[in-house]
């Protein structure tokens, strides 16, 4: 949605280079940086066109350089360009829930227009330092492996790493469900430069798992903003800001806890790099834009906790050629509070969520923040799993019987821990037939302590697979015992 004004300030296209346009305005009527410009008229084929651009540079000599948010095909020099006098603005509020928008805040789900009384500009200042929540607090997700080993910070930023088919989407949907049911919060999903098919699949999966209510969108738990792979770089560069702006409304006005998903943060950087050279900037390392740090910082600094609400962000991070030193992921890492790494090995074993307990990290896992009991339990779990990992080669060559008594006990407990880290999800009920479980942090710590202390050494390891709290595992063990008689 773009604020339209009277035709008072009209310029003319002087040059078109792909998605970048040069526009000349009368003397003293130059539009400001980030203003939205509208091109409406007929192209050479006689078809109506409506293109929105955003001012990026003032070139001097009465010219501005702007980046288009949609295809520039058919535009010609001399076409009229109207300065709207304001940045691109998007609709905000509960009216956005259950709907899909593009970068301009226009609905693209064929469900009719969105008549929002309130719109926010996508370029906004980060919250003032005095309004920030400075005391770190843990954001309970109800997912055992996350809460115990990689606790999320309320208002923090978490990187989600994982290849195709290891369960990124399912974890995202479970988090969306849990924040809505347990925290009374909402979510915003920013699809930045990913495949159109994935966006479509995600929408349908959300309808299937009741995250989106198709009949009454206002009962949905999420708003979706898409800027797909096939769209011009201008749209991909700004769609993250459009999603963030919708999330900021829920935080600042509705005073809610918000989850913001960005899939994929790398594509945001990639789009900026595509536009940068066309804007005449000198490329930096590996061909990225020289403003890489600023671009990422402007987005990330707005994702934070205030005294009244929080935006906790989970960002899928694509690592080009698995090179963590590439400037794009390296710049992103500087802003992250934690990483959740999904392991294909665990997914192959059928352990879901397939979060790697040794590869995932969190800055929140400190005794001063989570408490001594939580910290000790988490470190003991990791130490047991690490020892099991070291022993796997010996087991593969010599067999389990060749291990010492202590090591055999460690292996048995590690296998129970590994299985107890799995959990049935609410959003996967449709596929698994098992009812979903939300496990509080207290129950999680209690369960793992009981396994580590040896209290449950006599229970079969399959009793710990896909259960919620430890009481369920004990009940499942009794059922297995009764069935085997």
Swiss-Prot record:
Its EC number is 7.1.2.2. Gene3D superfamilies: 2.40.10.170, Bovine Mitochondrial F1-atpase, Atp Synthase Beta Chain, Chain D, domain 3, P-loop containing nucleotide triphosphate hydrolases. The keyword Signal does not apply. InterPro entries: AAA+_ATPase, ATP-synt_VA_C, ATP_synth_F1_bsu, ATPase_a/bsu_AS, ATPase_alpha/beta_chains, ATPase_F1/V1/A1_a/bsu_N, ATPase_F1/V1/A1_a/bsu_N_sf, ATPase_F1/V1/A1_a/bsu_nucl-bd. The keyword Ion transport applies. It is an enzyme of class 7 (translocase). Keywords: ATP synthesis, ATP-binding, CF(1), Hydrogen ion transport, Ion transport, Membrane, Nucleotide-binding, Thylakoid, Translocase, Transport. Belongs to the ATPase alpha/beta chains family. This is ATP synthase subunit beta. The lineage of its organism: Bacteria, Bacillati, Cyanobacteriota, Cyanophyceae, Gomontiellales. The gene is atpD.
């Amino acid at each position: 949605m773009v604020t339209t004004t009277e035709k008072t300030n009209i310029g003319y296209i002087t040059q078109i280079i792909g998605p970048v346009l040069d526009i000349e305005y009368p003397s003293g009527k130059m539009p400001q940086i980030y203003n939205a410009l509208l091109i409406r008229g007929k192209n050479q084929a006689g078809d109506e066109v409506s293109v929105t651009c955003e001012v990026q540079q003032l070139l001097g000599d009465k010219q501005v350089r702007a980046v288009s948010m949609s295809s520039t095909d058919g535009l010609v020099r001399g076409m009229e360009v109207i300065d709207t006098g304001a940045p691109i603005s998007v609709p905000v509020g509960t009216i956005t829930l259950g709907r899909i928008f593009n970068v301009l805040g226009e609905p693209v789900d064929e469900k009719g227009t969105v008549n929002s009384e309130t719109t926010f500009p996508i370029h906004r200042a980060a919250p003032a330092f005095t309004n920030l929540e400075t005391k770190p607090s843990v954001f309970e997700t109800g997912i055992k492996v996350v809460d115990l080993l990689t606790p999320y910070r309320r208002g923090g930023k978490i990187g989600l790493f994982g290849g195709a088919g290891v369960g990124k989407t399912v974890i995202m949907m479970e988090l969306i469900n849990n924040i809505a049911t347990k925290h009374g919060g909402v979510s915003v999903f920013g699809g930045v430069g990913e495949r159109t098919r994935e966006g479509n699949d995600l929408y349908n999966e959300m309808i299937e798992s009741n995250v989106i209510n198709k009949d009454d969108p206002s009962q949905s738990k999420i708003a979706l903003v898409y800027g797909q792979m096939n769209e011009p770089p201008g749209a991909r560069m700004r769609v993250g800001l459009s999603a963030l702006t919708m999330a900021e409304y829920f935080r600042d006005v509705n005073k809610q806890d918000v989850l913001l998903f960005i899939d994929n943060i790398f594509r945001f950087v990639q789009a900026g790099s595509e536009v940068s050279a066309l804007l005449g900037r000198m490329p930096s390392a590996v061909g990225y834009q020289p403003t890489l740090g600023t671009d990422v910082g402007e987005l990330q600094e707005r994702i934070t906790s205030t005294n009244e609400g929080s935006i906790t962000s989970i960002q899928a991070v694509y690592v080009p050629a698995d090179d963590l030193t590439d400037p794009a992921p390296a710049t992103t890492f500087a802003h992250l509070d934690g990483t959740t790494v999904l392991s294909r090995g665990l997914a192959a074993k059928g352990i879901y969520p397939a979060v790697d307990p040794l590869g995932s990290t969190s800055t929140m896992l400190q005794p001063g923040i989570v408490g001594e009991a939580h910290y000790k339990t988490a470190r003991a779990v990791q130490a047991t799993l690490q020892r099991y990992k070291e022993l796997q080669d010996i087991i593969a060559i010599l067999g389990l019987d060749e291990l010492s008594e202590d090591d055999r006990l460690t292996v048995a407990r590690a296998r129970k821990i590994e299985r107890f880290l799995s959990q049935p999800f609410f959003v996967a009920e449709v596929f698994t037939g098992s009812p979903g479980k939300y496990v509080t942090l207290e129950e999680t710590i209690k369960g793992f302590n009981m396994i580590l202390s040896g209290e449950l050494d006599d229970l079969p390891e399959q009793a710990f697979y896909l259960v919620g709290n430890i009481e369920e595992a004990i009940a499942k063990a009794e059922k297995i015992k009764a069935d085997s008689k």
